[in-house]
């Protein structure tokens, strides 16, 4: 890997090419690839699970006014503990939790990835193990490795489900400092049954060590009747539930993540957070969005409608899919998912190849974007052959 200076005229500057092997990079980081979905300029981008609905003109105006007000004191450091924002988040979480969430139980940071990083800084590190069950959100593994925490990957069943027995057996075997679960799971999209999370909590409580972290980034999109893991917090002090404002709140550009947990967990994060880590502007934007929660969350039902439309139509093309409680659908199985991905891209539709053989993931976009996806996929699969094992092979030219 060769590094070159970036920016205007960089190619004319006398920078000596430098091989990264010459840098004192930690051995545990060598050979790794950075996280990132392709950022391509195509008409239809359905690969990063963004909410396709931009903020309204009224909300844009409100955010602008809040940012302008924050700018009047930009010479001062922000509220170091983001007390007002955390109080607003606690109020927002209370209905899902089924109990009165208190400010002391909530923490906020720059996106849920910083939340995950702080948890690993506080409870992981050298000589400690983090356990996850793959396929799942790849940043759990990457942040674990970045914090010198050993990563152990447990495996899901062939249909991507996870049973209490599998989870408890893995915890007993590896005695992890942190157990990462996704509900809904990314990339498969299905929420975990509460008994799986409860079993994980009981297992770490039995060992006397470890935390259970449930990543609920897509919780607002879950199907009717599916409870949030927040309801388990009063009974399990070692449980942490993380969320984000990037998805349901359509604030991916603001980078706001948060968690709910026992106050002692929040107190622990004060030890690893950077000073004034959440800017005045970020706090102002997030609080404004929460004040307009009804408007923003009104887009959730529209997104779910397009998700459910995809779920209804894909089986008619011979495809299998995982039940979705998120704003995306995981579908397959293909003999060559990369060829399908490329065919869709050639048609101007970008979906996500997460690297799992035979499967792709598509975000539920606007109606016209879903039209484009379904049309392109139908054309791609024209003449394809479904084998006895259910695997789809594209027609040869």
Curated annotation (Swiss-Prot):
Cofactor(s) the record lists: pyridoxal 5'-phosphate
E.C. number(s) listed in UniProt: 2.6.1.9
Keyword terms: Amino-acid biosynthesis, Aminotransferase, Histidine biosynthesis, Pyridoxal phosphate, Transferase
GO terms under biological process: L-histidine biosynthetic process
Entry-linked CDD domains: AAT_like
Pathway stated in the Swiss-Prot or TrEMBL entry: Amino-acid biosynthesis; L-histidine biosynthesis; L-histidine from 5-phospho-alpha-D-ribose 1-diphosphate: step 7/9
Keyword presence, Transferase: yes
GO function terms (MF aspect): histidinol-phosphate transaminase activity; pyridoxal phosphate binding
PROSITE patterns per the UniProt record, alphabetical: AA_TRANSFER_CLASS_2 (PS00599)
Catalytically driven reaction(s): L-histidinol phosphate + 2-oxoglutarate = 3-(imidazol-4-yl)-2-oxopropyl phosphate + L-glutamate
Keyword GTP-binding appears in the UniProt entry: no
Top-tier EC class: transferase
Positions of post-translational N6-(pyridoxal phosphate)lysine modification: 247
Membership in a protein family: Belongs to the class-II pyridoxal-phosphate-dependent aminotransferase family. Histidinol-phosphate aminotransferase subfamily.
Assembly information from the UniProt record: Homodimer.
PANTHER family, per database record: HISTIDINOL-PHOSPHATE AMINOTRANSFERASE, HISTIDINOL-PHOSPHATE AMINOTRANSFERASE-RELATED
NCBIfam families cross-referenced by the UniProt entry: hisC, PRK03317.1
Name of the protein described by the UniProt record: Histidinol-phosphate aminotransferase
Taxonomy of the source species: Bacteria, Bacillati, Actinomycetota, Actinomycetes, Frankiales
